[in-house]
Amino acid sequence: MSLLDYFKTKKKPSTAATAKERLQIIVAHQRGERDAPDYFPQMKQEIIEVIRKYVKVGADQVSVQLDQNDDNLSVLELNVTLPEQS
């Protein structure tokens, strides 16, 4: 029987499992934002405005994230998807 099981197609994860995984990602992201300093939303907006001064990008093309470690270390991560040059 195990030989036949080898040839069977693997089952897709259920929609409930997919929804649970997505929800866990959202909750983790919101927890990270909750621990951010009070000035972070304004700083994030100002960084995006400066980038838009020089490069035409949409809000969905700029990602600013603040990660904090237990060692009292903060990392500001900035990802910008630049448009292709013509």
Curated annotation (Swiss-Prot):
Keyword annotations of the record: Cell cycle, Cell division
Keyword Nucleotidyltransferase: no
InterPro entries: MinE (IPR005527), MinE_sf (IPR036707)
Biological processes per GO annotation: cell division; regulation of division septum assembly
Statement: the UniProt record of this protein carries the keyword Acetylation: no
Pfam families in the record: MinE (PF03776)
Top-rank lineage group of the source organism: Bacteria
Family: Belongs to the MinE family.
UniProt function note: Prevents the cell division inhibition by proteins MinC and MinD at internal division sites while permitting inhibition at polar sites. This ensures cell division at the proper site by restricting the formation of a division septum at the midpoint of the long axis of the cell.
Protein's recorded name: Cell division topological specificity factor
Organism whose genome encodes this protein: Shewanella piezotolerans (strain WP3 / JCM 13877)
Gene: minE
